[in-house]
Design a protein with these regions (language model features):
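Glycine/proline-rich, positively charged
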Residues: 30, 103-198
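N-terminal binding-site loop/beta-alpha segment at the start of enzyme catalytic domains
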Residues: 1-99
Length: 198
């Protein structure tokens, strides 16, 4: 099996390799890694033939996207396939010191708080912010991220955010981005089957 052989993704025009680089570790999910190690990881992946990179605003509260953006910036344009996620919008904390003292999710992540937002405006804001962090004018895939009980904590919140995605226009925003050619595919990254029933 060739891990880099391309396969069509569902009914989209996008072709993906079987193997890609997941960006959670570049956001310090398991351990704090230095910038030099992040750069070396991205260089080694590229040199080994990896061209598919998956990340999220949530990974390191933007750190993973910054690192991947920096790592791909000087590579030949159009060779990398990039996937990121929507559903969380980052913003500056009102009290930076209190936030830094309480932060446990992402050690040495960027100093941003987040709010879940699957609405039309939230999806577009998340997409545009990700483009800035990734140093790109488009990404290939946008994934609806963590819209599930495991991450939101209650069925009420899951239901509310599903309503944002549906009646609040989040799905419409994704479809408009795809129709405009600004993304090639829409996905869902959840931890429970059947979470997104519509």
């Amino acid at each position: 099996m060739d891990p880099f052989a391309l396969r069509r993704l569902g009914r989209t025009s996008l072709e993906l390799p079987r193997l890609g680089l997941g960006g959670a570790s570049l956001g310090n999910i398991f351990d704090v890694i230095a910038e030099s190690q992040a750069d070396a990881t991205l260089d080694a992946a590229w040199d080994a033939g990896v061209r598919f990179y998956d990340t999220s605003p949530w990974y390191g509260r933007g750190l993973s996207e910054h690192r991947i953006g920096r790592g791909l910036f000087l590579r030949p344009p159009g060779e990398a396939i990039v996937s990121t996620k929507v559903g969380r919008v980052l913003f500056a904390p009102a009290d930076v010191a209190a936030f830094a003292a309480s932060e446990r999710s992402w050690p040495n992540g960027l100093q941003f708080q987040h709010r879940h937002d699957y609405s039309y405006a939230g999806v577009l804001r998340s997409y545009e912010d990700s483009l800035q962090r990734l140093r790109r004018n488009r990404v290939d895939v946008l994934v609806i991220h963590d819209l599930d009980l495991a991450n939101l904590g209650s069925e009420e919140l899951v239901s509310r955010h599903l309503d944002e995605l549906d009646a609040g226009g989040g799905m419409r925003a994704l479809e408009e981005l795809k129709a405009a050619g600004l993304i090639k595919a829409i996905g869902a990254g959840v931890n429970r089957m059947g979470t997104i029933p519509r």
